[in-house]
Amino acid sequence: MQASQRISTILGGGSDGWEVFNRARQMIDAGTSVTELTIGEHDIRTAAPILQDMHRAAVGGHTGYASIPGIAALRDAIAARVTASTGVPTTRDNVMITPGGQAALFASHTAVTDPGDTALYIDPYYATYPGTLRGVCAKPVAVQAHASDAFQPRASDIAAAAKGAKSLLINSPNNPTGVVYTRETLEGIAQVCRDHDLWLISDEVYDTQIWEGEHISPRALEGMEERTLVVGSMSKSHAMTGSRIGWVVGPAHVISHLVNLATHTTYGVAGFIQDAALFALELGKEFETEIAEPFRRRRDLALAVLASQNVVGAVPNGGAMYMMLDITATGLSGEAFAYGLLEAHHIAVMPGESFGAAAAGHIRVAMTIEDSAFEAAMKTLCAYAESLTTQA
């Protein structure tokens, strides 16, 4: 018996891009100490008060079936947060709670694409994007951003791919590049969506991690409220990655359909986790800033290290917990550089090629270890790159 085409073709017959990460984990399992700069996992755990509230809610009995769209108070809090940050009036009817941002991405594409529909996404991309699109039986089509444009997508390139497409997925602040899309970029994207009648799915899980520029939700742009679904999550903003709690914000009629989808798939999110998420949101912006601050510090540390040499270049990262580094001067691909760095110095980074063709010749560094260790790893990475150019 064979598995379904839907499941067996999720990876598209190719790599999932995680070979270097898997090699690093094999080394760790064998007893080798490895500095991991690979995945976007905070080096702190979920704050004790949030866990205490989660425990209180669970012991208090919120362990049965919870409201499938999400508990009203949490949906209201997210709606108020979105209204305050974007100026777009938002109510609980525009919000559905999901088991994390990944589930929100899957649900959003299920809502707006039918089997065989073309779904666009920007390259470089978060590694799950094309598989998510295949998982809903859409046809994934990448639109390349360019290093020469600091990975700001060109509206003209999106328009060239948009004929007959149904949706476009964007992510700002961006994983893997750390790029924050400018207003000009987003206005161009919005114009393409209006011109070609595209649904826009905006992954905004890094919206609290802004180092330069501003976060603009495209749902707030003219004519976009009724054609945009926004994906949000507590994972990055509140260091709640394992709690698996996210949301979709969009038109009320689409949210009602997503509630039907959840009824037949996830059947909602545990009530005690939703209670803890509500508690976390009520801690306010000061808490979100506290969670984001280590990445701001480490970005500054990395930029200082990079300024002291001229082999490794930095993509302008205005947000998120990552840096994309240009290592083309070494003559190696991102993958070859990552493997070499791992074997020579036991430092694990992600090859740019893991995130699409546009990031070839780059590596992604996650700023997710303690400051002094991160600074030391960056110095070693740059010294390794310089050694390669000396050998050449």
What do the PLM-derived regions correspond to, one by one?
Residues 61-65:
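A short acidic, glycine-rich active-site loop
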Residues 2-6, 10, 20, 27-57, ...:
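PLP-dependent class I/II
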Residues 69-70:
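Short beta-strand to alpha-helix junction loop
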Residues 13-15:
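Extracytoplasmic catalytic/substrate-binding loops of multi-pass membrane glycan-assembly enzymes
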